[in-house]
């Protein structure tokens, strides 16, 4: 044993000594056309993650480079990245890297999403050339460039979001909420939202300053947390550039922008500045509802490589971006005079990254990243109110009996009596979310013989907080009912994580195997909350096996072949809408006597219902697996990937019910009162609700009115996890045919199959508290349903989309023309209703007015009316006893008409016979046309026309057996143009 330990130590020391025998690479980066040096070019050694930045003379030096095979990548803003394989066995001096300017004079130009061929997971990149060609005005528009993606009409007046490998927004599992969005490493988060469980909106992100967008739809690195389905990484321009001015226009949106990358002094420092103004209108026929985006961005980059940092360079990048804007309908003459809606969409985003290249045997480099994102999303609406009589406006937040009073000028009245007449009032919600994140990561790249190994170890900390005050009014005297709920009083949600990942590349003969495996451990800490601390682990692994590759296969039929696969777990933190839902209030009018003087008197019982703490709440979890392959057949590149995603413990808010009683005094209780109606003065006890009538003349003694005790159910809301998972699966394909050289044309065929199925088998409660029992008292039964209280408790859908893109590039005239045909080949949806273990919860019924099952209760494959029953029901007197519903309901239909009528309020029936029918929409097509023309090096013009065939046909639905307009599925014909000037 001792010999084994000594041998291991000697081997380790030998390895370290071997690492010390490193080399130096120095060279120069040159413009291939002019042979002039390219300043600020970044040189990266891919296998060892070492880097350098070219100086004013284009020179660079990378020291302490270990022996072995490596890949040298040279990139610079405005140039095409150059990548070459090199063998390092000695010092390399005078290395010359020639890079070419990225413009339309190149023989090959790509205007589609490019596959990341070196990744073991599915990732695609959209570069600036592609973004210019499609004239992106909202970053979410790039979804149409993904396999099977469809082009939508740009509309900044609506909220735009990313949603990767998902279907409609109505699907279970909060699909868009799981898609992470980052801008230069700054995470945009919607965790601090109190209103919804959805992903971040992208309307306030500048598009003119974007250099590239990477979409990771496969298994992400463990470096990324708080994610569910996909990551979108947006990179802005960094580097020296000429002045650039852009003008974009389409019928609904106008944009103007200007940018410049300045070199600062003799240092390797650059300041990128960008300004943009975008204005969009909702409807050209009524151009008054609009959205404005006024943005300025600054990015400072610097390199410190002098003195003690000569061999250990330090690169600093600091970014600051601000946006002022939002939605406004104030000028709309079609709206009621004096009414308007204003929604702010202001933001301030700052980010910093520090990359320190150490090139030590035990560590390659350290990265420090920090970001903060602050938003001001205040919404205000001015509405017109018309009251034919006095109305009660409730604002109380304490339990008890309260009487409406005339406004006394203070802000602490429980019920304000709003007088009759007309009034205007401004109501709003003050919403100011803030997210900050700090991360520290250590990288170690080394090799063991021919095996390359890269390890990353990191920690990060992020926090979400909302500094808004919630709902408010500008005039409490005329405001409708609302309650104060201070967002800023709720605790911040903090999350800390540590992760470790190993990326190993193993040559196996002429093949190679790349394995990436990592583990992320997270803890969520919510001080001052009952949820306290929560912990989770997220393992992820991806692998890629390259079977055939290399330059020697250029003349072979099979030139490249690889297989890849992966599995990963990702955990999503909850939004504040789940952790701290806005409290609800049960307001019951308990006394409202008639008055001979016309003065209204309202007595209310207020019961606040704060959200219940759920000790069993866990964080939403996504489990994802994918298998893919890439093959090059005689120059035709084919990519195929299948995936499966399972969302577990999706966040939702559920209900439970409590029984309570209150004192109710109606008009009949005053019949025995001896005080004349004209002389009555009413008062109500705040604790008991007992009404006392006094004689305002003082002649008669006061009388206590005996009210009635009423029993009712009240609703409790609580954060919960969906008890059933949602499943998504699909297939994506991309076929890039070999370029047709005589006409310099490329053809791409891409598409996707997407499937979704979800059935909720968890037990939920529902009671129609607004209904009355047959005796006129509040409703007292609670239904316990499988999945949902509605007709269906699940759904399934399938889609097949295919796109054909033909791109012709004419380098001699610097022009590129593309046409894309988008086809929906299959669009299927169906509602489902399933009980636990095959039990039935929905039944065919023979009558549109009846609640009883038909003789043949089957329904899924028939066009019949249906009725849905709860599995059980419980009563006010014994809420813990679960009574089988169907058995009791059928018995009551024959033996107890009163019970039958009361229980029927828990049933749900369809009003048409095709609710559960399969819905196949017939195929439909659309065509888009785009052209970009460069005018020398000083200008370029792009034009597009989407749905330019103006396809206004109809589609057939197998569910309704009717035709409907394509306008519900395709955007109307629209067009746009962009002019870019460079000087």
Give names to the regions the model predicted.
Residues 304-324, 343-530:
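Face-selective signature of the C-terminal outer-membrane beta-barrel domain
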Residues 28-34, 41-46, 73-79, 89-132:
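Short, acidic, small-residue-rich periplasmic hinge/interaction motif at the N-terminus
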């Amino acid at each position: 044993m001792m010999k084994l330990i000594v041998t291991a130590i000697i081997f380790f020391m030998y390895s370290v000594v071997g690492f010390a025998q490193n080399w130096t690479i120095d060279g120069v980066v040159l413009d291939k056309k002019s042979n002039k040096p390219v300043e600020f070019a970044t040189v990266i050694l891919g296998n060892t993650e070492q880097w350098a930045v070219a100086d004013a003379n284009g020179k660079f030096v990378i020291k302490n480079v270990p022996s072995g095979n490596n890949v040298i990548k040279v990139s610079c803003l405005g140039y095409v990245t150059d990548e070459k394989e090199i063998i390092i066995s000695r010092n390399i001096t005078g290395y010359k890297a020639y890079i070419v300017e990225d413009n339309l004079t190149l023989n090959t130009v790509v205007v589609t999403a490019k596959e990341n061929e070196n990744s073991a997971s599915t990732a695609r990149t959209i570069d600036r050339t592609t973004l210019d060609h499609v004239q992106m005005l909202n970053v979410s528009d790039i979804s149409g460039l993904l396999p099977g993606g469809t082009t939508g009409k740009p509309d900044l007046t609506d909220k735009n979001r990313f949603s990767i490998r998902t279907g409609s927004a109505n699907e279970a599992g909060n699909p868009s909420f799981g898609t992470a969005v980052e801008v230069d490493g700054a995470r945009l988060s919607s965790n601090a939202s109190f209103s919804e469980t959805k992903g971040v909106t992208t309307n306030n992100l500048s598009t003119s300053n974007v250099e590239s967008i990477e979409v990771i739809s496969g298994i992400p690195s463990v470096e990324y947390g708080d994610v569910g389905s996909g990551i979108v990484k947006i990179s802005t321009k960094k580097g020296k550039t000429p002045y650039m001015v852009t003008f974009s226009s389409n019928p609904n949106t106008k944009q103007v922008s200007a940018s410049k990358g300045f070199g600062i002094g003799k240092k390797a420092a650059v300041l990128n500045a960008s300004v943009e103004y975008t204005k969009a209108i909702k409807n050209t026929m009524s151009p008054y509802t609009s959205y404005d985006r006024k943005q300025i961005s600054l990015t400072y980059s610097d390199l410190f490589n002098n003195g003690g940092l000569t061999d250990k360079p330090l690169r600093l990048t600091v970014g600051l971006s601000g946006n002022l804007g939002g939605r406004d309908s104030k000028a709309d003459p079609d709206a009621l005079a004096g009414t308007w809606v204003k929604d702010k969409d202001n933001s301030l985003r700052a980010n910093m990254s520090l990359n320190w290249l150490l090139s030590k045997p035990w560590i390659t480099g350290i990265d420090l990243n920090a970001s903060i994102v602050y938003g001001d999303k205040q919404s205000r609406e001015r509405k017109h109110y018309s009251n034919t009589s006095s109305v009660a406006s409730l604002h109380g937040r304490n339990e008890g009996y309260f009487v409406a009073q005339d406004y006394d000028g203070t802000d602490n009245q429980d019920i304000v009596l709003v007088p009759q007449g007309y009034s205007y009032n401004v109501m709003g919600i003050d919403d100011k979310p803030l997210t900050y994140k700090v991360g520290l990561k250590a990288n170690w790249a080394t090799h063991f013989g021919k095996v390359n190994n890269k390890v990353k170890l990191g920690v990060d900390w992020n926090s979400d907080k909302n500094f808004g005050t919630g709902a408010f009014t500008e005039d409490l005297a005329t405001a409708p009912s609302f309650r104060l709920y201070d967002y800023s009083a709720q605790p911040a949600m903090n999350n800390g994580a540590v992760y470790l990942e190993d990326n190993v590349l193993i040559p196996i003969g002429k093949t190679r195997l790349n394995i990436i495996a990592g583990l992320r451990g997270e803890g969520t800490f919510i001080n001052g909350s009952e949820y306290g601390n929560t912990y989770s682990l997220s393992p992820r692994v991806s692998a890629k096996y390259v079977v055939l590759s290399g330059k020697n296969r250029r003349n072979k039929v099979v030139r490249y072949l690889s297989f890849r696969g992966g599995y990963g777990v990702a955990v999503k933190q909850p939004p504040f809408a789940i952790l701290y839902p806005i409290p609800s209030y049960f307001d019951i009018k308990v006394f409202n006597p008639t008055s001979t003087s016309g003065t209204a008197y309202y007595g209310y019982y207020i019961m606040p219902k704060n959200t219940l703490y759920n000790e069993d709440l866990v964080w939403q979890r996504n489990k994802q697996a994918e298998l893919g392959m890439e093959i090059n057949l005689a120059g035709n590149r084919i990519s195929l990937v299948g995936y499966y995603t399972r969302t577990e413990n999706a966040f939702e808010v559920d209900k439970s019910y409590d029984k309570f009683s209150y004192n109710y005094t109606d008009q009949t209780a005053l019949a025995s009162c001896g005080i004349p109606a004209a002389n009555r003065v009413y008062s109500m006890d705040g604790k008991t609700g007992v009404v006392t009538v006094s004689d305002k003349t003082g002649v008669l003694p006061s009388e206590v009115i005996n009210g009635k005790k009423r029993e009712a159910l009240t609703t409790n809301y609580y954060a919960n996890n969906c008890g059933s998972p949602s499943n998504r699966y699909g297939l994506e394909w991309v076929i890039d045919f070999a370029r047709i050289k005589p006409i310099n044309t490329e053809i791409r065929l891409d598409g996707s199959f997407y499937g979704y199925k979800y059935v909720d088998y968890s037990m939920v409660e529902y009671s129609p508290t607004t209904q009355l029992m047959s005796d006129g008292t509040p409703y007292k039964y609670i239904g316990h349903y499988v999945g949902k209280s509605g007709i269906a408790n699940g759904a399934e859908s399938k889609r097949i989309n295919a796109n054909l893109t033909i791109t012709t590039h004419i380098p001699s005239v610097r022009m590129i023309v593309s046409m894309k045909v988008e086809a929906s080949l299959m669009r299927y949806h169906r509602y489902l209703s399933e009980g636990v273990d095959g039990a039935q919860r929905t039944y065919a019924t023979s009558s549109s007015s009846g609640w009883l099952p038909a003789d043949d209760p089957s329904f899924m494959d028939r066009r019949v009316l249906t009725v849905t029953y709860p599995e059980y029901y419980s009563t006010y007197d014994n809420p813990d006893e679960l009574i089988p519903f169907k058995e009791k309901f059928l018995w009551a239909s024959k033996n107890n008409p009163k019970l039958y009528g009361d229980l029927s309020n828990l049933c749900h029936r369809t009003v048409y016979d095709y609710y559960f029918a399969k819905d196949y929409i017939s195929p439909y097509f659309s065509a888009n046309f785009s052209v970009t023309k460069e005018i020398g090096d000083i200008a370029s013009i792009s034009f597009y026309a989407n749905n330019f065939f103006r396809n206004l046909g109809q589609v057939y639905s197998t569910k309704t057996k009717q035709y409907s307009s394509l306008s519900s599925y395709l955007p109307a014909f629209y067009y746009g143009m962009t002019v870019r000037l460079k000087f």
